[in-house]
């Protein structure tokens, strides 16, 4: 296939993918204008709210067991309130995608999440998700002249106009290495706010530290208990200062899985904690389950369902009722029935009817009937309406879906016919592509895709024309890769090499040092003396700066490192800070500068290599040297416990230097999953997305770093096939055409499937990201003239 046709087809694939995504992830259509009271508006307008003030404390990723289960919870003060009846607890079901932006939309508007919000969740400067024109709980508070103060996650300041808040101070939600300062910057406002309660009617606090700990160390991190106690002390500090006319609500926006990630639909991710706190509640009866339970609960529930379960969006009509506000127009929530006790019976009945009529307006063609229906009957009917609305919350753009799928089918036919030949290589490629394509129609196969790639990789290895000795070495390496991390979304194993090495830090870190040095070896293969000197300096600076950064990063995050490396990092920071008395607390000041120095060295090294090649015509082994620089970047963007895997990669490439395109394709996919990646948003790793990024957030820099950190092993094996012929490239392109076409057809056919947003949609996003990388990399290599 000619070069021009290849690039036309590659571009066509990218256009088709983004056309399809544009139709599959449209902005949700919402009802405009603000809501008004529907049933007996004059009675409701004349009524007084149950509470005068609201304190809303959002603890990011507060899973239900963190609040209610003995082995997982250290909220002693809150436990006392739950047992005395001054607090009522619930497990709040958080609709996927379980990331902050869509969940805050759900908590404030009561509407179903839009998957596009999960993607925009990392776009700090994005304004397309703004709720200025959409009816919400905060807009109703603002309209009814409640003074609101906000402190915490600045996602709120993206969602709502600043004029909603009398006072505000945002903290950045994505610097996940920060456990303490990000919460201190919220808590420092609490004493003043408690002493000046006349200055606000609604106080919103959003804490991020617990979520950050989860991302770094998982749900059982040793930092968790102290963070629980810290949050509990904040709750106590506030509760002891407020009076009976103030309602306090403590909740998580979502939960997390055992690895500390979230975004998917597992029980841990969707089970968030919720508690209403008020001295008044003691006079009334909490849910039957709570009355018969002693908190914290002794038994651990694998489904994380503790006390009574409600929908998280039920907070919206419930708070609207308690503060006598109209329910936001797009709310799909249903009033939590226990809290109806706080209203006079006649007013409570009116509020339930109002909720019923408001909810039925969201379901076209539904005949609302109030006559002779009790509040209990209406609540039950509303639950059924709520379920049906959640199932049909998206409006697809079928024109874009049709165009995108049609272009993919056309491209698939062209590239398949053009490549057709009866050879082992072609049959292996087509067989792999068809097998993966068929798997796109089953949610379980997508969730456990790593299993498919494992068996395909082993099969391809056995068919390779290499000696049995080499096959044995490669097979051993693959088995180590396979056992390194937990993969997939259904099962978690305790005994993996990743966990074992983290408990033997000396072995881990010396393996890391050896890996960094091994990646630099191609630099040292030179014939010219001047090249040798330049190469030696480049390797030295790249290795030293990257190793120093990873050690400092580990120390700042509370990970153990060998004493020798600890001393080395401390002295390096002391030199940078020009402070001989630098201590461990000073190391954090060096992280951003060291990372930037590393990236600058990478840039200078590449410029020198290109200059020596094209200006002096004397660069030896230039391609491998450029790849070594890129490998150093990939190492920096990889978690410390995964870095030794690159040492195995180096061994495999030395054993099979002439890697076949199909084996490279297998390793690109297999290693992505064995690094801990999945087809779920929950495993998108943000830990290394901020290397070298200061408080001046740049979405494009963070986006590139995030891509590199999540696709590092795949990029390694994709680059291992350079240089490659256009015949080899078209076989790879054919694979992504076939699997992409099947994925698009599956998404259309299963668009109303239960797991469309938690399984199929994330897979589509991963596919689009990798397709973009392949096209950009192909164009970049061509422009550089490497091939």
From Swiss-Prot:
Predominant location: endoplasmic reticulum
Subcellular location per the Swiss-Prot or TrEMBL entry: Endoplasmic reticulum membrane
Keywords in alphabetical order: Endoplasmic reticulum, Glycoprotein, GPI-anchor biosynthesis, Membrane, Transferase, Transmembrane, Transmembrane helix
Annotated CDD domains: GPI_EPT_2
One of the record's GO molecular function terms: CP2 mannose-ethanolamine phosphotransferase activity
Family matches, as Pfam families: Phosphodiest, PIGO_PIGG
Highest taxon listed in the record's lineage: Eukaryota
Single biological process term from Gene Ontology: GPI anchor biosynthetic process
Transmembrane stretches, start-end: 400-420, 426-446, 455-475, 504-524, 536-556, 591-611, 629-651, 671-693, 699-719, 740-760, 767-787
Disulfide linkage: none
Signal peptide feature range: none
One GO CC term, this protein: endoplasmic reticulum membrane
Membrane topology: Multi-pass membrane protein
Enzyme Commission no: 2.-.-.-
The keyword Cell membrane appears for this protein: no
Glycosylated residues, chain numbering: 33, 185, 397, 485, 581, 617, 669
InterPro entries linked: Alkaline_phosphatase_core_sf, Phosphodiest/P_Trfase, PIG-G_N, PIGG/GPI7, PIGG/GPI7_C
Pathway annotation from the record: Glycolipid biosynthesis; glycosylphosphatidylinositol-anchor biosynthesis
Assigned protein family: Belongs to the PIGG/PIGN/PIGO family. PIGG subfamily.
Function summary: Ethanolamine phosphate transferase involved in glycosylphosphatidylinositol-anchor biosynthesis. Transfers ethanolamine phosphate to the GPI second mannose.
Protein name stated in the entry: GPI ethanolamine phosphate transferase 2
